[in-house]
């Protein structure tokens, strides 16, 4: 029977896509200290400043500055040629130019006035450096090859080699390359199927490799694209471009290995320097220089709420001036110490991203989940490096946590959810609908905050008890009293906080790939249960109650659907909504107005209602409120049923009556 088959398919469908909820952790690894070359001699466009390395230089003196748009030079490694022609074309003409173009438009730097020539790597780790030298000198000469991440640096991009037996016995060997002119940063692009690419979640990774002498700004880096992860599929475009932009930003400055080199607004080091101009404390165990507390500090939250009582919870805060200002502005919390950094994820994620719980879909959090945006906070971070002047006009709006106040920014998500429940309020942006209990789907679709996609609450059971500081529930409906400590949001990096998350699903052979974004036409199928319309003009609308499907006395309640994607348009100050196979669009005159849809499709009567959002959420120009008619939607329709079926039912009922009379 159709209802049974559809229900079984629907349940299996939800269980099957659960493992594919979007979550791609960043694969960044801080480069080893020995792989980073500092003190690359350069010339900036500030004639009144002496370049460091000359006798009259003072590495802490403020510069006379002129900033100009960042110029990034792409240099493609020969490994790119191993990609298919279609993928090569995508990488060369779309993926890299778009990712690089974003940062060139977003950032200004002190421009280079001469070609960049990079340092050669020394044979040994010992070298000489003294005032008056143009270049760092190697004690045993230079290596044949100088690499930048996965890339070999062309000899034409390199300085000659200065080798010394002692500070007074030096000679120059090798050729002085022409360098790379008209650029401020060289990005070496590779496509090696490296060991780091073996994980199915790794799309690309990047890091810086050389820093200039005057201000310590990174001037060269490598981005490696994992060949098997590259796709020209429309559904993969957003995540690929966002990931490459994210990785490039690690090379430009968002790196735990660079915090100790940050400068203030006058160009002075934030972290104390030794007589050689380097940060004073090298943490060999962790592989980076330690920074001063004016950059990052640890704060103890002494009353961190959990479902089992309050605990002390340490957090790490970026406390530089612009970052603090933007964090306070975003949450509307004037007492917030700064912006929280990630405290989970291990090497490469810990401290090198924004905290996922606090800034969920900010693109510089440690894992991609949905709708990544580069917000004012990340641009403020770049300004506080002392290397960049950001263009805040390119910042994207971060809805997560916006203007939710100090309680949201400074307390656990468990306390936020608990207090909202007591008040009878929605726990936005968190949720408490269980996605599945480990054996069956309990998923219910909702709209994302931006109303551009369907989403599911990612609250799931784990096999082991959650860490005590991340037990965010005292109890959960339908879960035994001792079971709540096993439940949390599926994104561990978000402190196990549950939130609405977009989803996707693929066939094993990758012949089909769909996700929950309303804007992609390929995500929909004509005549599906709730009569959705996917496409460029579609948005997400929520339902006041589940849809139903009826035929001949049989009824199916589509309880998993509480939202869907529908076409919309703005006309004469009014928002209109369209469903599948509708001849006309339905007007939304006011927020929370209901639109009633009734259609006969494939012999079944489909019935459902949509809730109208604020007109301003979707339309630029909205008219004044009007009197809402009592009913807006389709006229009443009879439940389909063939005459033969009706006669059969009538005969069966008569037979039952006859048996009853006889008894």
Swiss-Prot record:
Its cofactor is Zn(2+). Essential for the coordination of mitotic progression, and also plays a role in cell migration. The active site is at residue 247. Its EC number is 3.4.24.-. GO terms for molecular function: metal ion binding; metalloendopeptidase activity; peptidase activity. GO terms for cellular component: cytoplasm; membrane. GO terms for biological process: cell adhesion; cell division; proteolysis. Transmembrane segments: none annotated. Zn(2+) binds at residues 246, 250, 353. Binds 1 zinc ion per subunit. Gene3D superfamilies: 3.10.170.20, Leishmanolysin , domain 2, Leishmanolysin domain 3, Leishmanolysin domain 4. Belongs to the peptidase M8 family. Keywords: Cell cycle, Cell division, Cytoplasm, Hydrolase, Metal-binding, Metalloprotease, Mitosis, Protease, Zinc. This is Leishmanolysin-like peptidase. It is found in: Cytoplasm.
């Amino acid at each position: 029977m159709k209802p049974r088959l559809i229900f079984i398919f629907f349940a299996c469908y939800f269980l099957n896509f659960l493992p594919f909820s979007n979550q791609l952790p960043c694969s960044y690894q801080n480069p080893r200290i020995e792989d980073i070359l500092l003190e690359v001699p350069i010339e900036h466009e500030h004639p009144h400043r002496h370049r460091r390395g000359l006798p009259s230089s003072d590495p802490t003196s403020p510069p006379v500055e002129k900033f100009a748009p960042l110029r990034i030079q792409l240099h493609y490694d020969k490994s790119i040629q191993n990609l298919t022609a279609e993928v090569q074309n995508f990488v060369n003409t779309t993926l890299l130019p778009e990712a690089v173009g974003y940062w060139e438009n977003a950032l200004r730097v002190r421009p280079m006035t001469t070609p960049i020539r990079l340092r050669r790597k020394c044979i040994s780790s010992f070298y000489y450096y003294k005032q008056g030298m143009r270049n760092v000198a190697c004690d045993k000469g230079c290596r044949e090859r100088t690499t930048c991440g996965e890339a070999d640096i062309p000899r034409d991009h390199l300085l000659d080699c200065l080798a010394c037996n002692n500070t007074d016995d030096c000679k120059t060997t090798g050729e002085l390359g022409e360098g790379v002119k008209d650029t401020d940063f060289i990005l070496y692009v590779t496509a090696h199927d490296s060991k780091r690419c073996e994980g199915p979640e790794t799309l690309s990774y990047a890091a810086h490799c050389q820093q200039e002498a005057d201000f310590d700004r990174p001037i060269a880096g490598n981005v490696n694209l994992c060949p098997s992860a590259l796709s020209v599929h429309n559904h993969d475009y957003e995540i690929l471009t966002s990931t490459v932009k994210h990785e490039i930003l690690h090379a430009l400055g968002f790196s735990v290995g660079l915090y100790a080199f940050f400068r203030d607004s006058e160009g002075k080091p934030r972290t104390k320097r030794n007589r050689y101009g380097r940060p004073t404390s090298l943490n060999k165990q962790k592989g980076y220089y330690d920074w001063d507390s004016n950059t990052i500090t640890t704060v103890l939250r002494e009353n961190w709420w959990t479902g089992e009582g309050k605990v002390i919870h340490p957090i790490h805060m970026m406390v530089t001036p612009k970052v603090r200002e933007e964090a306070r502005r975003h949450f509307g919390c004037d007492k917030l110490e700064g912006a929280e950094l990630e405290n989970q994820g291990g090497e490469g994620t810990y401290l090198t991203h924004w905290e996922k719980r606090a800034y969920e879909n900010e693109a510089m959090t440690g894992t991609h989940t949905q709708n990544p945006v580069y917000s004012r906070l990340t641009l403020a971070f770049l300004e506080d490096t002392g290397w960049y002047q950001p263009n805040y006009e390119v910042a994207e709006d971060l809805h997560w946590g916006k203007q939710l106040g100090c309680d949201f920014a400074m307390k656990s998500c468990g306390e936020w959810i608990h207090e909202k429940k007591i008040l009878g309020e929605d726990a936005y942006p968190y949720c408490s609908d269980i996605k599945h209990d480990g054996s069956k789907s309990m998923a219910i679709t909702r709209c994302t905050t931006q109303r551009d996609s369907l989403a599911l609450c990612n609250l799931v059971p784990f096999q082991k008890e959650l860490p005590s500081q991340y037990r965010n529930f005292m109890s959960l409906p339908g879960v035994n009293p001792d079971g709540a400590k096993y439940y949390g949001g599926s994104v561990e990096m978000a402190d196990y906080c549950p939130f609405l998350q977009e989803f996707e699903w693929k066939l094993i052979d990758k012949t089909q790939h769909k996700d929950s974004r309303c804007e992609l036409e390929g995500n929909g199928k004509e005549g599906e249960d709730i009569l959705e319309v996917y496409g460029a003009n579609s948005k997400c609308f929520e339902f006041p109650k589940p849809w139903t499907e009826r035929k001949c006395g049989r009824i199916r309640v589509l309880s998993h659907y509480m939202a869907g994607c529908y076409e919309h348009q703005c006309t004469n100050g009014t928002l209109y909504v369209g469903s599948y196979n509708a001849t006309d669009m339905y007007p939304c005159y006011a927020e929370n107005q209901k639109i009633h849809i009734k259609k006969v499709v494939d012999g079944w009567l489909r019935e459902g209602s949509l809730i109208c959002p604020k007109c301003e959420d979707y339309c630029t120009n909205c008219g004044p409120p009007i009197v809402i008619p009592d009913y807006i939607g389709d006229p009443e329709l009879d439940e389909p049923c063939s005459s033969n079926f009706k006669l059969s039912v009538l005969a069966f009922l008569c037979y039952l009556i006859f048996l009853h009379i006889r008894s």
